[in-house]
Amino acid sequence: MSEVKLILDDCLDAMREMEADSVDAIITDLPYGVTNCAWDAVIPFAPMWEAVKHVLKPRGAFVTTASQPFTSALVMSNLQWFRYEWVWEKSKGTGFLDANRRPLKAHENVVVFSDAATDYNPQMEKGTRHHRGQRAQSKPTTVYGKFTHSLEYSDERFPKSVMRFAVQERAEHPTQKPVALYAYLIRTYTNVGATVLDFTMGSGTTGVACVKTGRNFIGIELDEGYFDIATKRIAEARMQLPLLEVT
């Protein structure tokens, strides 16, 4: 069973007290600063990165959802660590009050940082099946030269940078993300038994996804109300473990 540790505290203070190089990945949902709510206040970048570098193992991934203009500000705060982004395409758009002036927004960013190449377990997708035995050979290019390795096609496809997950219908936090999205990210950037940190835990979605995928979890949350919600959700997920397939 996954080990779970939940901390009610300021995330920067709590992370400074943690052991150095103690987590395999940080997978979180940082506040974007798009509202005046206390829970949406942007964490100062300089002390945040200092804390991240303290707790994250070398080559560990720091993955967070984001949205413009916060995405650009976050990337520029540590361009050296920035690797790439995904786009999460939502099942529903937002911004109906401005629908006559701009398109409905139906996506968010998922931004990946690391000090070096990270663990990456591509979650293969099913595509159109090619005839077995069909092979391809590329033409010479000015960049790589002639590629002579023969490829045998199958129905497995590597993931593309656009992910499609339905939005959370019954949410206990205003920005609660779907468990399926975070389980996907956890499987992609960690292996079974790894330790994942979410230092802006909110209602505990990352923790629930860790329990379902067989990862250890450390969650930090400042708001006592959301901390209690997260504690309950993660406990319920652990009770369902005999019914879950850990991957």
Name each model feature, range by range:
Residues 1-219, 224-229:
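Core catalytic lobe of class I
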